[in-house]
């Protein structure tokens, strides 16, 4: 109960800070009021086309995320078998983490165009994070238990399903939950920066309103993204809690 109270207090402080900033700046073209943003959000839902934008963004996020999750799981499983293999993979993942996201966006736009670039950008950002999270799950398995299990069971598939999977299940789900929310945010960013006005999506919607200098509507879309991201995190925590029980 106290935790929820602190969250409410935190939200109140944010809104209060926003209102104070609005009055200090005294320019709605730079800092719109919370009421203006709320009205813009209402107008956004009245148009109903926003639901298509949400669907398109989620669709691209899910496709890219599932591919990155499966490949991340495969790479993490292979790397968990040997420290040497992990060291071989290390330069690849170091590079993927070190290269700025903007560089990937420019490269993919030049190579594959605006339409498909967001898919690749989400994959390239999510893949190393998923890999590392799952690999840590493998590393947390007690080495003695691994040895005992190998002695008792020589079937690798049965070994994985009956022993390894239950041991890393929480790590797999945690990686899934945390990475999906990140993937969603990256997808929106990729859509915004690729800058196509012909495609549907929340990021493309931001790009359109940026050219119209409609700060109120941009903040309304940003608020919608925050609400959706929070919803994904809440649902993820509920799923994780149910599985742990």
Model feature map: region roles:
Residues 63-93:
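Transmembrane-helix boundary motif in ABC transporter permease subunits
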Residues 83, 174, 215-245:
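C-terminal transmembrane helix and the adjacent membrane-cytosol boundary/short C-terminal tail
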Residues 92-98, 111, 120-134, 196, ...:
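Hydrophobic transmembrane alpha-helices
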Residues 110, 186-225:
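Glycine-rich helix-loop "coupling/hinge" segments at transmembrane-helix boundaries
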């Amino acid at each position: 109960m106290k935790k929820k109270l602190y969250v409410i207090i935190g939200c109140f402080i944010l809104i209060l800070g926003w209102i104070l900033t609005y009055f200090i700046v005294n320019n709605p073209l730079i800092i719109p009021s919370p009421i203006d943003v709320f009205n813009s959000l209402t107008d956004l839902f009245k148009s109903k086309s926003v639901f298509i934008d949400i669907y398109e963004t989620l669709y691209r996020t899910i496709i890219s995320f599932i591919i990155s999750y499966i490949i991340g799981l495969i790479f993490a499983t292979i790397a968990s078998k040997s420290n040497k293999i992990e060291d071989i993979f290390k330069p690849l993942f170091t590079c993927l983490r070190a290269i700025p996201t903007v560089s990937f966006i420019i490269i993919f736009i030049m190579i594959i165009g605006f339409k498909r670039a967001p898919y690749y950008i989400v994959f390239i950002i999510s893949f190393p994070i998923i890999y590392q999270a799952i690999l840590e799950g493998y590393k947390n398995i007690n080495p003695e238990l691994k040895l005992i299990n190998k002695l008792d069971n020589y079937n690798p598939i049965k070994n994985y399903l009956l022993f390894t999977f239950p041991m890393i299940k929480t790590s797999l789900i945690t990686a899934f939950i945390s990475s999906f929310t990140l993937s969603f945010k990256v997808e929106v960013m990729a859509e915004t920066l690729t800058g196509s006005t012909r495609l549907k999506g929340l990021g493309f919607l931001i790009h359109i309103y940026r050219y119209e200098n409609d700060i109120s509507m941009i903040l309304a879309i940003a608020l919608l993204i925050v609400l959706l991201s929070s919803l994904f995190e809440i649902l993820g925590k509920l799923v994780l809690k149910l599985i742990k029980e």
